[in-house]
Protein backbone atom coordinates (compact mmCIF):
# COMPACT_ATOMS: atom_id res chain seq x y z
CA UNK A 1 0.00 0.00 0.00
CA UNK A 2 2.82 2.39 0.90
CA UNK A 3 4.47 1.63 -2.46
CA UNK A 4 1.24 2.43 -4.32
CA UNK A 5 0.86 5.70 -2.42
CA UNK A 6 4.43 6.71 -3.27
CA UNK A 7 3.91 5.70 -6.90
CA UNK A 8 0.75 7.80 -7.11
CA UNK A 9 2.58 10.74 -5.54
CA UNK A 10 5.37 10.47 -8.11
CA UNK A 11 2.83 10.30 -10.93
CA UNK A 12 1.14 13.45 -9.63
CA UNK A 13 4.46 15.27 -9.36
CA UNK A 14 5.36 14.23 -12.91
CA UNK A 15 2.00 15.48 -14.16
CA UNK A 16 2.59 18.85 -12.49
CA UNK A 17 6.03 19.12 -14.12
CA UNK A 18 4.54 18.30 -17.55
CA UNK A 19 1.82 20.95 -17.10
CA UNK A 20 4.33 23.54 -15.92
CA UNK A 21 6.63 22.91 -18.88
CA UNK A 22 3.66 23.16 -21.26
CA UNK A 23 2.64 26.52 -19.76
CA UNK A 24 6.20 27.86 -19.91
CA UNK A 25 6.39 26.75 -23.54
CA UNK A 26 3.10 28.50 -24.34
CA UNK A 27 4.45 31.68 -22.76
CA UNK A 28 7.67 31.48 -24.78
CA UNK A 29 5.74 30.88 -28.01
CA UNK A 30 3.39 33.79 -27.23
CA UNK A 31 0.38 31.45 -27.39
CA UNK A 32 -1.35 33.42 -24.66
CA UNK A 33 -3.12 36.59 -25.69
CA UNK A 34 -5.46 39.19 -24.23
CA UNK A 35 -8.93 40.14 -25.33
CA UNK A 36 -10.58 43.28 -23.99
CA UNK A 37 -14.24 43.74 -23.08
CA UNK A 38 -15.38 47.38 -23.00
CA UNK A 39 -16.95 48.85 -19.88
CA UNK A 40 -19.29 51.52 -21.17
CA UNK A 41 -20.18 54.96 -19.85
CA UNK A 42 -23.60 55.14 -21.50
CA UNK A 43 -24.26 58.66 -20.19
CA UNK A 44 -21.39 60.14 -22.20
CA UNK A 45 -21.22 57.58 -25.03
CA UNK A 46 -17.65 56.53 -24.37
CA UNK A 47 -15.59 53.57 -23.29
CA UNK A 48 -14.83 54.11 -19.61
CA UNK A 49 -12.43 51.18 -19.30
CA UNK A 50 -11.76 47.67 -20.56
CA UNK A 51 -11.29 44.37 -18.76
CA UNK A 52 -8.35 42.23 -19.89
CA UNK A 53 -9.36 38.60 -20.41
CA UNK A 54 -6.81 35.85 -20.94
CA UNK A 55 -7.07 33.55 -23.96
CA UNK A 56 -4.92 30.70 -25.28
CA UNK A 57 -4.31 29.95 -28.95
CA UNK A 58 -4.13 26.18 -29.36
CA UNK A 59 -4.49 23.98 -32.45
CA UNK A 60 -6.13 26.76 -34.42
CA UNK A 61 -8.64 27.51 -31.66
CA UNK A 62 -8.97 30.40 -29.22
CA UNK A 63 -9.55 28.91 -25.77
CA UNK A 64 -11.14 30.62 -22.77
CA UNK A 65 -9.79 30.09 -19.21
CA UNK A 66 -12.38 27.37 -18.66
CA UNK A 67 -10.20 25.11 -20.81
CA UNK A 68 -6.77 25.90 -19.36
CA UNK A 69 -6.96 27.68 -16.00
CA UNK A 70 -7.04 24.48 -13.94
CA UNK A 71 -3.72 23.40 -15.45
CA UNK A 72 -2.24 26.78 -14.47
CA UNK A 73 -3.52 26.35 -10.92
CA UNK A 74 -2.31 22.73 -10.72
CA UNK A 75 1.15 23.81 -11.88
CA UNK A 76 1.20 26.62 -9.29
CA UNK A 77 1.78 29.15 -12.10
CA UNK A 78 -1.00 31.65 -11.34
CA UNK A 79 1.32 34.39 -10.14
CA UNK A 80 3.61 34.05 -13.15
CA UNK A 81 0.61 34.30 -15.46
CA UNK A 82 -0.76 37.32 -13.59
CA UNK A 83 2.56 39.13 -13.96
CA UNK A 84 2.61 38.25 -17.68
CA UNK A 85 -0.91 39.67 -18.05
CA UNK A 86 0.09 42.84 -16.18
CA UNK A 87 3.10 43.44 -18.42
CA UNK A 88 1.01 42.90 -21.55
CA UNK A 89 -1.75 45.18 -20.20
CA UNK A 90 0.76 47.98 -19.60
CA UNK A 91 2.14 47.57 -23.12
CA UNK A 92 -1.36 47.59 -24.63
CA UNK A 93 -2.53 50.47 -22.43
CA UNK A 94 -0.25 52.93 -24.17
CA UNK A 95 -1.79 51.88 -27.50
CA UNK A 96 -5.45 51.68 -26.46
CA UNK A 97 -5.59 54.99 -24.59
CA UNK A 98 -4.86 56.81 -27.87
CA UNK A 99 -7.84 55.28 -29.69
CA UNK A 100 -10.49 57.79 -30.78
CA UNK A 101 -13.25 55.92 -28.92
CA UNK A 102 -11.39 56.14 -25.60
CA UNK A 103 -11.52 59.04 -23.17
CA UNK A 104 -7.86 58.93 -22.26
CA UNK A 105 -8.16 61.32 -19.31
CA UNK A 106 -9.36 58.71 -16.82
CA UNK A 107 -9.23 55.48 -18.83
CA UNK A 108 -8.02 52.34 -17.07
CA UNK A 109 -7.55 48.65 -17.83
CA UNK A 110 -8.54 46.03 -15.27
CA UNK A 111 -7.20 42.53 -14.78
CA UNK A 112 -8.21 39.74 -12.44
CA UNK A 113 -6.28 38.70 -9.35
CA UNK A 114 -7.09 35.93 -6.90
CA UNK A 115 -7.68 36.24 -3.18
CA UNK A 116 -4.41 34.37 -2.56
CA UNK A 117 -2.51 36.85 -4.72
CA UNK A 118 -3.97 39.88 -2.98
CA UNK A 119 -2.94 38.35 0.38
CA UNK A 120 0.71 38.07 -0.67
CA UNK A 121 2.48 41.37 0.06
CA UNK A 122 5.73 40.23 -1.58
CA UNK A 123 3.84 39.42 -4.78
CA UNK A 124 2.07 42.79 -4.63
CA UNK A 125 5.46 44.49 -4.35
CA UNK A 126 6.37 42.87 -7.68
CA UNK A 127 3.18 44.28 -9.21
CA UNK A 128 3.93 47.76 -7.88
CA UNK A 129 7.52 47.59 -9.15
CA UNK A 130 6.37 46.65 -12.65
CA UNK A 131 3.85 49.51 -12.65
CA UNK A 132 6.38 52.03 -11.33
CA UNK A 133 9.19 50.88 -13.64
CA UNK A 134 6.92 51.46 -16.64
CA UNK A 135 5.95 54.93 -15.37
CA UNK A 136 2.30 54.16 -16.01
CA UNK A 137 -0.16 56.98 -15.30
CA UNK A 138 -1.67 56.85 -11.81
CA UNK A 139 -4.97 54.92 -11.57
CA UNK A 140 -4.56 53.44 -15.05
CA UNK A 141 -4.40 49.84 -13.79
CA UNK A 142 -7.19 48.19 -11.80
CA UNK A 143 -6.94 44.86 -10.00
CA UNK A 144 -10.26 43.00 -9.80
CA UNK A 145 -10.52 40.75 -6.75
CA UNK A 146 -13.00 37.91 -7.04
CA UNK A 147 -15.27 38.23 -4.02
CA UNK A 148 -14.16 35.21 -2.00
CA UNK A 149 -12.99 37.01 1.09
CA UNK A 150 -12.10 35.09 4.23
CA UNK A 151 -13.64 37.08 7.07
CA UNK A 152 -10.70 36.57 9.44
CA UNK A 153 -8.25 37.97 6.87
CA UNK A 154 -10.11 41.13 5.84
CA UNK A 155 -7.90 43.42 7.95
CA UNK A 156 -4.76 42.09 6.26
CA UNK A 157 -6.41 42.36 2.84
CA UNK A 158 -7.34 45.99 3.51
CA UNK A 159 -3.74 46.78 4.46
CA UNK A 160 -2.59 45.32 1.15
CA UNK A 161 -5.29 47.22 -0.72
CA UNK A 162 -4.09 50.44 0.93
CA UNK A 163 -0.56 49.61 -0.20
CA UNK A 164 -1.71 49.19 -3.81
CA UNK A 165 -3.89 52.31 -3.79
CA UNK A 166 -1.05 54.37 -2.30
CA UNK A 167 0.95 53.29 -5.34
CA UNK A 168 -1.68 54.44 -7.84
CA UNK A 169 -3.45 51.13 -8.48
CA UNK A 170 -7.25 50.94 -8.47
CA UNK A 171 -9.09 48.11 -6.72
CA UNK A 172 -12.39 46.52 -7.74
CA UNK A 173 -14.43 43.86 -5.96
CA UNK A 174 -15.55 41.52 -8.73
CA UNK A 175 -18.71 39.38 -8.79
CA UNK A 176 -20.12 41.29 -5.83
CA UNK A 177 -23.16 39.60 -4.31
CA UNK A 178 -22.27 36.02 -5.22
CA UNK A 179 -20.31 34.70 -2.27
CA UNK A 180 -22.03 36.86 0.31
CA UNK A 181 -25.19 38.77 0.92
CA UNK A 182 -22.56 40.50 3.02
CA UNK A 183 -23.04 44.21 2.31
CA UNK A 184 -20.85 44.80 5.34
CA UNK A 185 -17.97 44.00 2.98
CA UNK A 186 -18.52 47.39 1.34
CA UNK A 187 -17.73 49.03 4.64
CA UNK A 188 -14.74 46.88 5.53
CA UNK A 189 -13.02 46.79 2.12
CA UNK A 190 -12.19 50.22 0.74
CA UNK A 191 -12.29 49.44 -2.97
CA UNK A 192 -12.60 52.03 -5.72
CA UNK A 193 -15.07 50.02 -7.78
CA UNK A 194 -17.84 47.49 -7.18
CA UNK A 195 -18.65 45.06 -10.01
CA UNK A 196 -22.16 43.77 -9.50
CA UNK A 197 -22.58 40.14 -10.51
CA UNK A 198 -24.60 39.06 -13.56
CA UNK A 199 -27.07 37.41 -11.17
CA UNK A 200 -28.62 40.82 -10.47
CA UNK A 201 -28.68 41.84 -14.14
CA UNK A 202 -30.53 38.64 -15.04
CA UNK A 203 -33.36 39.54 -12.69
CA UNK A 204 -33.50 43.25 -13.34
CA UNK A 205 -36.35 42.98 -15.89
CA UNK A 206 -38.87 41.20 -13.72
CA UNK A 207 -37.61 41.18 -10.14
CA UNK A 208 -38.48 44.00 -7.79
CA UNK A 209 -36.01 42.52 -5.32
CA UNK A 210 -33.11 42.82 -7.80
CA UNK A 211 -34.01 46.45 -8.44
CA UNK A 212 -34.16 47.23 -4.73
CA UNK A 213 -30.83 45.52 -4.08
CA UNK A 214 -29.12 47.45 -6.88
CA UNK A 215 -30.66 50.70 -5.66
CA UNK A 216 -29.45 49.99 -2.13
CA UNK A 217 -25.90 49.22 -3.28
CA UNK A 218 -25.95 52.39 -5.37
CA UNK A 219 -26.81 54.39 -2.25
CA UNK A 220 -23.78 52.93 -0.47
CA UNK A 221 -21.58 53.68 -3.50
CA UNK A 222 -22.79 57.28 -3.52
CA UNK A 223 -21.91 57.71 0.15
CA UNK A 224 -18.44 56.23 -0.31
CA UNK A 225 -17.83 57.71 -3.80
CA UNK A 226 -17.31 54.30 -5.40
CA UNK A 227 -17.93 53.49 -9.05
CA UNK A 228 -20.25 50.61 -9.86
CA UNK A 229 -20.12 48.35 -12.92
CA UNK A 230 -23.15 46.19 -13.65
CA UNK A 231 -21.95 43.03 -15.39
CA UNK A 232 -23.65 40.62 -17.76
CA UNK A 233 -25.92 43.07 -19.57
CA UNK A 234 -27.26 41.42 -22.73
CA UNK A 235 -30.61 43.09 -23.51
CA UNK A 236 -31.82 46.60 -24.34
CA UNK A 237 -34.51 46.35 -21.66
CA UNK A 238 -31.80 45.93 -19.03
CA UNK A 239 -29.94 48.99 -20.31
CA UNK A 240 -33.13 51.08 -20.28
CA UNK A 241 -33.76 50.17 -16.64
CA UNK A 242 -30.17 50.94 -15.63
CA UNK A 243 -30.47 54.36 -17.28
CA UNK A 244 -33.18 55.22 -14.77
CA UNK A 245 -30.72 54.94 -11.86
CA UNK A 246 -29.56 58.41 -10.92
CA UNK A 247 -25.85 58.03 -10.29
CA UNK A 248 -22.99 59.50 -12.29
CA UNK A 249 -20.52 56.67 -11.63
CA UNK A 250 -22.58 53.77 -12.94
CA UNK A 251 -21.22 51.79 -15.90
CA UNK A 252 -22.22 48.73 -17.92
CA UNK A 253 -20.33 45.65 -19.11
CA UNK A 254 -21.82 42.89 -21.20
CA UNK A 255 -22.53 41.41 -24.60
CA UNK A 256 -25.27 43.96 -25.34
CA UNK A 257 -22.50 46.48 -25.94
CA UNK A 258 -19.64 44.18 -26.92
CA UNK A 259 -18.08 40.76 -26.63
CA UNK A 260 -14.37 40.68 -25.69
CA UNK A 261 -12.29 42.05 -28.58
CA UNK A 262 -8.70 41.73 -29.67
CA UNK A 263 -6.70 44.94 -29.51
CA UNK A 264 -7.11 45.73 -33.23
CA UNK A 265 -10.89 45.20 -33.21
CA UNK A 266 -11.16 47.39 -30.12
CA UNK A 267 -9.83 50.34 -32.12
CA UNK A 268 -12.82 50.18 -34.48
CA UNK A 269 -15.37 49.57 -31.72
CA UNK A 270 -18.40 51.86 -31.57
CA UNK A 271 -21.74 51.61 -29.79
Label every PLM stretch briefly:
Residues 58-62, 86-90, 175, 254:
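Short acidic-capped amphipathic helix/loop micro-motif used as an active-site/signal-coupling element
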Residues 81-156, 232:
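Catalytic core of bacterial c-di-GMP phosphodiesterases, primarily the EAL and HD-GYP domains
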Residues 16, 61-65, 74-75, 82, ...:
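Catalytic-site-adjacent helices and loops of nucleotide signaling machinery
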Residues 125-128, 156-159, 208-215:
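Charged helix-capping and loop-helix junction motifs
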Residues 2-33, 72-76, 115-117, 263-271:
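C-di-GMP signaling machinery
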Residues 94-97, 132, 158-166, 215-222, ...:
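Surface-exposed amphipathic alpha-helices with a cationic face
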Residues 12-71, 173, 258-260:
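Active-site core of bacterial EAL-family cyclic-dinucleotide phosphodiesterase domains
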Residues 1, 11-12, 42, 115-119, ...:
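EAL-family c-di-GMP phosphodiesterase catalytic domain
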Amino acid sequence: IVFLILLKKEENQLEVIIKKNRIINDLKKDNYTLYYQPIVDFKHNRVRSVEALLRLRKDGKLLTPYHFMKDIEDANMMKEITLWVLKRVIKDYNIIRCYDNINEKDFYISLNVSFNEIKDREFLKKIVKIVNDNKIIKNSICLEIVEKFVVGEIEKIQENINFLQDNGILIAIDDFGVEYSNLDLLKKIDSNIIKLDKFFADGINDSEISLKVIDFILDICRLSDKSIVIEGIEEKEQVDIIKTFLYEKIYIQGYYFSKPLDIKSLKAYTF
